[in-house]
Amino acid sequence: MTTGILLGIARHARSKAPMEMLDHADVTLEGGIVGDFRGAMKGKPYKRQVTLIERADWDAAMADVGHSIPWQERRSNLLVDGLDLPQVAGVRLRIGADVVLEVTRETDPCERMEALAEGLRAALTPDWRGGACAMVVQGGRIAVGDAIRIEEQWPSHSERSTTWATFTASESSSARI
């Protein structure tokens, strides 16, 4: 599906800190989800500002390991339902009216998952089941219950720059004629 719903928002103030569940959050270009330590990490631009996981994937992993662990223990920022997260970098997701995220890569399950339940790391490994990492393209406010949808494929930053330069050059040439 190309449209879903945001079921959960979580953040953690520092590495290994407990996840804090939120009803709504501000999302910024500089810091991802405000108050989340990972979103504020540097790296121009930081490609893991926000992490997302599908409810169906988390439920499938739980069934595989025979446990029922709350989704936020995955340490993802956003839980989505009814949307197949894109498994390719560069795809953009709109949440609510304003926020746009760009998928940067798969979220690789770490050893912490194995500490939660034996076999969980392996259960989260196939087909991006562990979720997706994203960077913020456009900030704003999100809330549980917001729609989340895949945007039409946008050109990359370099493609936009080339298009703009071509347009500007042709516009300038036309103006001189």
Placement of each model-derived feature along the sequence:
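Metal-cofactor-dependent catalytic cores
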Residues: 1-177
